Amino acid sequence: EEYVNPKKEVNSVKEAIDGAKDIIAESVSDEADYRIWIRKATVQHGKVISQAKDENAESVYEMYYDFEEPVNRLAGHRVLALNRGEKEKFLTVKIEAPQDDILRYLEKKMIHSDNPYTTPILKEAAEDSYKRLIAPAIEREIRSDLTEKAEDGAISVFKKNLHQLLMQPPNV
């Protein structure tokens, strides 16, 4: 109760605890080592999932209306197709990470003793940090990396095909 201070807009014990959880969540999300581990786990064990916004709509993206593939096996042309389908509002695309493993990892890093008062608060802070702060950022990073690699691959194929076309003898 010593942290309750109406002058600082902390009017109850619950508000004080919620404020502490927010601070902990922010701190956890700023830990570079945690982000590196979570990103690696998401790339190795996560899945790219796409679903139709309207299953009755006909489009060239129908094969992606109920699609799922491991992040680390997604071909470049599929990344580009998923991006187009999302941009054209036929698909919703997300990365599903191994959330249970990630939360266990964070809890193991954050909780060093089993205290009946602090353990539940730290678990909630870990989950909030992951779901609200870390997961969206990691998903954006991974999707951006996948898109960049896919675009580089497409340019490379185009370059190779153009070179072959230009090196053909002229038709006389």
Predicted segments, located by residue:
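Duplex nucleic acid-engaging cores and interfaces of nucleic-acid transaction enzymes
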Residues: 1-171
